[in-house]
């Protein structure tokens, strides 16, 4: 003998469990199915347990896997081939079969692909149609819940995207930018849209400043009118520019008037119109006379109510709030002190006569300028005004 085993005519079993392959020679061909299972448990010790469910399949001449259920199937397999190729399946898992693992992995990848497609479709904007995908019928409840959650998150993301896009829109955001700029400088809409306030009082008596301010204060479409006594205002603004502030301090309102220059046109316009529309005739002579005698006890408003006695006849529209700028009132504030009223012993003289026009003592006129009294004429603002020297009444509460 040559020392080699004579395997001719004997049964050889090749068992495979996963990647582990064993070759076993069988001397007793009358082996049963239970003995074969016990043999496999001893061969693959540690991999097969007594309580594991083991399925044994053999490969025929065509390469197909045939299941062995009992001893008759095992004897028939032994007759077909002397080399019995067995494949073990433990607990139904296709670990030994590579093709079964590929199928299992392929099915898992298909499910993952469907989930990814559903998430991508939920993130698409609602206006654009997303790509249509065929969802298999064996979807679980968890997949549907994930789909609804992803749809809600997609809608929220589109809303946030739309809000961020509108924040950078220059046309829609222009009003907010203007409001932020005005609030940063401490301005309001009325101050920005309204006309600019009157500047300083040093140019209040000059004709060019009066013309420019009156044209700026008039609304479009209304003819601006020059106030009377241009020459007198020019002289008063040039000579008594310094005495104006002293007179304001003596009268008791000089500390309040310079603090609020934007409100001058509105305050004087209301007081001026109220003095001609609400007060009666006997009040104006009293105000004019009291202003010449006691300049420190009167408010600045009687100067405007008493002034029209010396003015020529002009339409009443020039004394409205929108047609009379603030510079005209500042220049006329010191004018009533330049003239003295006729004494009360002359009740027969009408208020429109120029006999009471006298310059104030100490008033020096400029060279080249003549002081001419205003032309006489009916006063359009007098409403049955009695002559001087009679009893007077105090102004109403709406005057101040």
UniProtKB/Swiss-Prot annotation:
InterPro entries on file: PB1-like (IPR053793), PB1_dom (IPR000270), PB1_TFG (IPR034857), TFG (IPR033512)
Lineage top rank: taxon: Eukaryota
UniProt-annotated site: Breakpoint for translocation to form TRK-T3, residues: 193-194
Entry annotated with the keyword DNA-binding: no
Gene Ontology molecular-function annotations: identical protein binding
GO BP terms in the entry: COPII vesicle coating; endoplasmic reticulum to Golgi vesicle-mediated transport; positive regulation of canonical NF-kappaB signal transduction
Coiled coil: 97-124
Bias (Low complexity) ranges: 237-258, 265-298, 307-327
Pfam families named in the record: PB1
The name this protein goes by in its record: Protein TFG
Organism of origin: Homo sapiens (Human)
